[in-house]
Amino acid sequence: MKFANLKIDSTAVVCLVDSDAGTYWPVADLVPGFSGDMVQFVQEYPNLKSKLEAKGEGKPLNGTTVLAPITQPRRNIFCVGKNYHEHAAEFSKSGFDSSAKEGELAPDFPVVFTKPASTVIGPGDAIPSHPEGTSQLDYEAQF
């Protein structure tokens, strides 16, 4: 079982999901009175976890859309670039890294940057290209 933020009838709903069975249960159906978003769910999880048991057959995932877990973070997201050797080497060879040194697998110090909360998107969502600011995008980001 997993927790996910699903779009159901144009509304974001925090759900318990069984991806193998293709079913979900809205947390609000399992925990009467819960009406929050994923941030509230995470904050209240210690009090909710004993009540989070799938009941019945669940609802089919067909017709739902997986959203970003937290669609509107409260502040900028701090990121670390080139944080493992394979990615650092790949990025250095790509020609997009003006700071790369010959044979460098990872920098001596972390590459830290932020992304505005407004840049969060869900799986499969289109990535705005902003052609006025750049002609190429890095293909990867992860939490």
At which residue positions do the language-model features occur?
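N-terminal non-catalytic cap/leader segment that marks the start of a structured domain
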Residues: M1-P110
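Non-heme Fe(II) oxygenase catalytic core, chiefly the N-lobe of the double-stranded beta-helix
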Residues: K115-F143
